[in-house]
Regions:
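Gly/Ser-rich "nucleophile elbow"/oxyanion-hole loop immediately N-terminal to the catalytic nucleophile
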Residues: 98-103, 154-190
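A domain-start/cap signature at the N-terminus of enzymes
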Residues: 60-107, 188, 198, 210, ...
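Short, solvent-exposed loop/turn and secondary-structure capping segments
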Residues: 103-104, 118-124, 157-160, 197-198, ...
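Compositionally biased alpha-helical segments
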Residues: 1-87, 141
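Active-site machinery of serine-nucleophile hydrolases
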Residues: 107, 111-166
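Short, proline-enriched alpha-helix->beta-strand connector loops that line the catalytic pocket
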Residues: 141, 224-229
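C-terminal catalytic histidine-bearing segment of alpha/beta-hydrolase fold enzymes
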Residues: 212, 228-232, 236-295
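Primarily recognizes the serine-hydrolase "nucleophile elbow" in alpha/beta-hydrolase
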Residues: 175, 181-225
C-alpha cells in the first residue's frame, strides 16, 4: 500500500507531490518528494478525490470487513420477498441467500403508484420489483431490494411516509453489508413524485434515481443537481401532465444538473404507462447500477 507517489490536492486547492505512507479513517501519512519530509494530516484537509483514493487503498488491504445482517434484517436473506414492517410502513424486502458478508451491495428502493397502497403488503410488488428479483437479472445485479407500501394513496409519498422510507434505507445501511455509494431509488406515477420528494429531502443519500411520470417543484433543482437522474414521461399522459416533468428537467438543465430525460412522443402510443418502456429498456438498469457516488 505504501510507496506510491502521486499528486495530492488540499481542500483549498493547493497541490503537493508526495509518497503515500499509510492511512486510517481520519488521517493520512505522506512523505513529500521535494525534501523527504514526512507528515500526517487530517483527511478533512485534502480533496474529496484524495479522500476516496485513501479509502480505496485501505479497503484493498483490509477489505470492507465482515458485516452480518442484524436488527430487523437478521435471518431475512432468503431469496424471497420477505414481509416486514418499519415505522408507519409495511414493506417487502429481498436479499439473496448467496450474498457474502465480506462484500458490499447496492440498495434499490421502489415506490409504487396510486392503487397499490394500503396494508396488504402485496400490491406494491407490481411492475419492477419482480423483474429486479428474477433469477437471471439478480445474478448479474445482486442487491438489497426494498418495496415499501404507502398506507394511504390519498396522502401519497409525502410527509411521514416518505421520511420513513428514508429512515428505512438508513436502517438497511446500519444492519446490512450495504455499499453506501450505490443506493438507488425509482418509482412510477405517485411513486415518481415520491422519488423526487425523497431526493429533495436527502439528496446526499442517493447515487441515482429513475422517476417515471411524476414531477416536482422546479425550486428543488439546485438542491438535487448533483444526483444522476434519468426521468421518463409520456407526452400524451392524461393522468399526470407531462409539464410536471418538463418543468423540473428544465430547471435542472439551467442549474447544470446531472439530468437525462426520455419523453415518449404522442404517436408512440405511450400515455401514462411510461414505466413499461422504461423498465423494459435494459439500458436504464445498466445506467442505474453503474452509478456510484465515489466515481
Amino acid at each position: 500500500m505504501a510507496g506510491e507517489v502521486r499528486e495530492w490536492v488540499s481542500s483549498n486547492g493547493k497541490k503537493l507531490e508526495a509518497e503515500f505512507i499509510s492511512g486510517t479513517e481520519k488521517f493520512v501519512t505522506l512523505r513529500r518528494t521535494s525534501d523527504g519530509r514526512r507528515f500526517t494530516i487530517n483527511l478533512d484537509k485534502i480533496s474529496d478525490e484524495d479522500r476516496e483514493w485513501v479509502k480505496q487503498k485501505l479497503e484493498e488491504v483490509e477489505g470492507p470487513g465482515k458485516k452480518e445482517p442484524s436488527g430487523i434484517f437478521e435471518d431475512r436473506l432468503n431469496d424471497s420477498w420477505e414481509k416486514m414492517e418499519f415505522g408507519t410502513l409495511k414493506f417487502r424486502f429481498w436479499g439473496g441467500k448467496k450474498l457474502k458478508n465480506t462484500k458490499r451491495y447496492p440498495v434499490v428502493v421502489f415506490l409504487h403508484g396510486r392503487g397499490s397502497g394500503g396494508s396488504d403488503n402485496e400490491k406494491q410488488l407490481f411492475s419492477v420489483p419482480r423483474k429486479l428479483s428474477s433469477k437471471g437479472f439478480y445474478k448479474d445485479n445482486p442487491s438489497f431490494l426494498i418495496a415499501p407500501q404507502c398506507p394511504d394513496d390519498n396522502k401519497g409519498w409525502r410527509g411521514v411516509y416518505i421520511k420513513d422510507v428514508i429512515k428505512l434505507v438508513n436502517e438497511s445501511i446500519k444492519h446490512l453489508p450495504v455499499d453506501k455509494n450505490r443506493i438507488y431509488i425509482t418509482g412510477l406515477s405517485m411513486g415518481g413524485f415520491g422519488t423526487w420528494e425523497a431526493l429533495s429531502i436527502a439528496p446526499e443519500l442517493f447515487a441515482a434515481a429513475v422517476p417515471i411520470c411524476g414531477g416536482a417543484n422546479p425550486s428543488i433543482a439546485k438542491k438535487i443537481k448533483k444526483v444522476p437522474i434519468w426521468t421518463h414521461h409520456g407526452e400524451a399522459d392524461e393522468v399526470v401532465r407531462v409539464e410536471w416533468t418538463r418543468g423540473i428537467v428544465n430547471a435542472l438543465e439551467k442549474a447544470k444538473g446531472n439530468i437525462r430525460y426520455t419523453e415518449y412522443p404522442e404517436d408512440s402510443g405511450i400515455k401514462h404507462d411510461a414505466w413499461t418502456p422504461c423498465y423494459n429498456n435494459p439500458e436504464v438498469f445498466e445506467w442505474m447500477f453503474s452509478q456510484a457516488k465515489n466515481k
